Amino acid sequence: MRLPGYAEAAPTLEIFNYDVLVVRAPAAVNRPGFGHIAFSVDHVASARAAVLHAGGQVVGDIITLQTSDDRKVTWCYVTDPEGNVIELQSWSE
């Protein structure tokens, strides 16, 4: 998949699926190896519900903090059905 906002020589995102899965440690944001991928979403709770409906799991609570420039950031961590950690985040003024 070509990432938006780039011309022909754009970075790509490759997603693989395997028939045989290797058991690994439980999902944790700070586990060794690949960390997580983050997505900016319009509404964190709605996006989280969609991930859970598709077979994902909760990794932590939904958190909202005010930043030093008076914006708010809301985020949470979930896993996809294969256990990959996903961060869902939303910024507001």
Q: Predicted regions: what is each one?
A:
Residues 82:
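Conserved ATPase active-site switch/coordination loops adjacent to the nucleotide-binding site
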Residues 1-39, 48-79, 91-93:
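Vicinal oxygen chelate
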